Design a protein with these regions (language model features):
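Surface-exposed, polar/charged faces of alpha-helical domains
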Residues: 37, 52-55, 59, 92-96, ...
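Bacterial N-terminal signal peptides that target proteins for export
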Residues: 2-14
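Bacterial N-terminal signal peptides
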Residues: 13-22
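Early exported N-terminus immediately downstream of N-terminal targeting peptides
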Residues: 31-117
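Sec/Tat signal peptide C-region and signal peptidase I cleavage site
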Residues: 23-29
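Short beta-strand edge/turn micro-motifs at domain boundaries
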Residues: 161-190
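Non-transmembrane domains of secretory- and envelope-associated proteins
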Residues: 185-223
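Surface-exposed, charged secondary-structure patches
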Residues: 103-105, 111-165, 215-223
Length: 223
């Protein structure tokens, strides 16, 4: 499966998605936390989990996978993202294939995120969170059900900042969920869609799922 071009950009998206989902809690007396609060809240818990850790991702990747599953994954709607990624092919998939694809796609993204952080320590990640990320104010009408939270990532060595957008929607449970990430206008969903469509045309939906299973199993053996 040709992930090379997609993965280079998605590694950046992955790192940002892991680190941006939190930076401190902003408490508001509202029934439903704002999208910005959701973005700001989560990694306060990530910071708490990391602050006393001396390990790198390479030392104990399973710890970081578990951290992502516990604190990051719940804020994404992977089924909705999967529907958007597969587009017209989603309805062609059987119920079992849909479930399998969602699970494998989620696993692919989480492992891509963690792998992108492989050489960094918990302290490195914490410093990055605290020093280089700025979640911009978000204005939206009270009735809004879709909101884009803009994030500015300070450039390295005086370079230009990276503009990032988290696309959130309000679900039926009145909870804000992420269903796409954009970095400098490049969408995670759109990027993967182009790659997956090529795989489906070559080997069908099941062929794509089988390749994702193989890729994820291989990633699990990489320490």
């Amino acid at each position: 499966m040709d992930y090379n071009r997609v993965t280079k950009r998605l590694l950046v998206m992955g790192v940002m998605a892991l680190t941006i989902l939190g930076l401190g809690v902003i408490a508001q007396a509202t029934t439903i936390p704002s999208p910005r609060d959701v973005v700001l809240d989560t990694s306060q818990r990530v910071l708490e989990a990391l602050k006393n850790q001396q390990i790198t991702v390479a030392d104990d990747p399973e710890y970081f996978y578990g951290l992502a599953d516990e604190l990051i994954v719940p804020h994404f709607n992977f089924r909705r993202m999967s529907q958007r990624v597969l587009g017209k092919y989603w309805r062609q998939a059987t119920d079992e294939q849909q479930v399998d694809f969602v699970n494998q796609f989620r696993q692919l993204l989480v492992r891509t995120y963690v792998t992108a952080l492989y050489k960094y320590s918990a302290k490195d990640i914490t410093n990055f969170l605290q020093e280089r990320i700025k979640v911009l104010p978000t204005n939206y009408p009270p009735e809004a059900t879709r909101v884009n939270v803009k994030v500015l990532v300070e450039g390295q060595n005086g370079g230009p900042p990276i503009n990032m957008i988290l696309n959130l929607y309000l679900n039926k449970e009145k909870t804000w969920k992420v269903d796409d990430i954009q970095v400098e206008g490049v969408s995670l969903v759109t990027n993967y869609r182009a790659t997956f469509y090529r795989e489906i045309r070559a080997g069908g939906i099941q062929g794509l799922i089988d390749k994702l299973v193989s890729r994820n199993q291989h990633a699990m053996t990489m320490k």
